[in-house]
Design a protein with these regions (language model features):
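A conserved SF2-helicase RecA2
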Residues: 1-2
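C-terminal non-catalytic scaffold/interaction domains in large multidomain proteins
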Residues: 7-207
Length: 207
């Protein structure tokens, strides 16, 4: 059942992104990009809070992070819990507690886990978010795909070479490393394979 839900969720995300394919009118691309917002007040304030509460109780904090930050990488979730509990490092016990809470949240149907990312099951909306210290490994394929799609809606077409730079700038990267470009291109390849975009003579366009 969980796998069916994940597929439905992924398909809904894809459909939602491409329902938005309508021409932007007077809206500028930069107006569609939002500042990355971190979850605060997640209900855990100390080490005792984390380790004395049941997985179901800690799951409420995971839900809050997912609601504010989803899609969010698990390592970011661990960091939020660590910081909220004023712990110096994310040791094995903390990771075990967080992973147990993630499982409880998944079982309750509040969070959907796809790969290393957590999604709020109540929302199919994926925003393009600008980060202060972006790391491409911590950005989901869905958010990268949404970024590519919105660029192509606004610009109509773009050279394959310049696309990674445009995408990375929207995420807050000041320069585009090879690793970042490779990840963006891998998502572009998936979009081409899915018939969502086409690549012709090095020019990328929406299908």
């Amino acid at each position: 059942y969980a796998e069916i839900e994940k597929e439905r969720f992924k398909n809904n995300n894809t459909l939602k992104a491409f329902d938005d394919k309508k021409l932007p009118g007077k809206v500028k691309l930069k107006d569609e990009i939002v500042e990355y917002k971190q979850a605060e007040d997640i209900g855990l304030t100390s080490q005792e809070d984390l380790f004395k509460k049941s997985s179901k109780e800690v799951a409420k904090s995971i839900d809050k992070i997912g609601e504010v930050e989803g899609p969010v990488h698990i390592s970011e979730v661990i960091k939020r819990v660590k910081d909220s509990c004023n712990m110096k490092r994310a040791g094995a016990n903390l990771k075990k507690a967080v992973n147990g809470a993630i499982s409880a949240s998944e079982n309750a149907g509040n969070i959907i886990k796809i790969g290393d990312f957590l999604y709020d099951s109540a929302s199919n909306d994926v925003s393009i978010r600008k980060r202060h210290k972006p790391n491409i490994d911590l950005i989901s394929d869905e958010e990268i795909a949404k970024n590519i799609e919105r660029i192509l809606v606004h610009k109509q077409s773009l050279s394959a070479k310049s696309l990674p730079k445009e995408v990375s700038r929207n995420f807050g990267f000041k320069s585009t490393s090879k690793k970042t470009a490779n990840k963006i291109n891998s998502v572009l390849d998936l979009m081409i394979a899915d018939n969502r975009v086409k690549l012709d003579n090095d020019i990328v366009e929406l299908k």
